[in-house]
Amino acid sequence: MRADMSVTSMLDREVYVYAEVDKLIGLPAGTAKRWINGYERGGKDHPPILRVTPGATPWVTWGEFVETRMLAEYRDRRKVPIVRQRAAIEELRARFNLRYPLAHLRPFLSTHERDLTMGGEEIGLPDAEVTIRTGQALLGDARWLASIATPGRDEVGEAVIVELPVDKAFPEIVINPSRYSGQPTFVGRRVSPVTIAQMVDGGEEREDLAADYGLSLKQIQDAIDYTKKYRLARLVAA
């Protein structure tokens, strides 16, 4: 990434293809594309949850990746109709005037400990008045992630997410689009946990790897466990 690239353009930076997003977040194959770009089934088009309209590009921007990661935290997403989820995202986008509302910190801070409400007419639903339990719950479920993500500032001072932990269980393994081509790395390091796990699998001593790469033995184990959990490489090391 160019040194003069703004945080805003970072959110618009094309970083991944859909299959990579599924793998990095741990989603079933095809999920990221459905959420981000919509899908067609039985001759019927289903609009995206996250994009305003479907696009022809095979690429996913950093802002879209962050939003997909946040949506993956929504515990009721299998119960709540897609139309309600999409409406909640649309309302957040309009209310905060943000292209990627789930990639900015302001919506998470603005709705903390209070309801976000909207009228049914605003989102095209028959309810006379809808409390956005969907939007509120989505923000609530993902708030832990927003609270520990690394923020940056855009040119107007908005706080946006520039680095995310890959998993609550592995807080020291992070994803940043400006480091290691957006692939997982350790905080403050440029080595991939997958590379570390593969070297252990290849017979390298953990103590030697820890010394060579400035990692703790716990981080070495985290690399192995993370790589196994997300099926990022074939491993036999325990």
Swiss-Prot record:
InterPro entries found in the cross-reference section: DUF433 (IPR007367), Homeodomain-like_sf (IPR009057), VapB45-like (IPR017277), WH-like_DNA-bd_sf (IPR036388)
Pfam family for this entry, one: DUF433
Protein name, UniProt field: Uncharacterized protein Rv2308
Domain of life: Bacteria
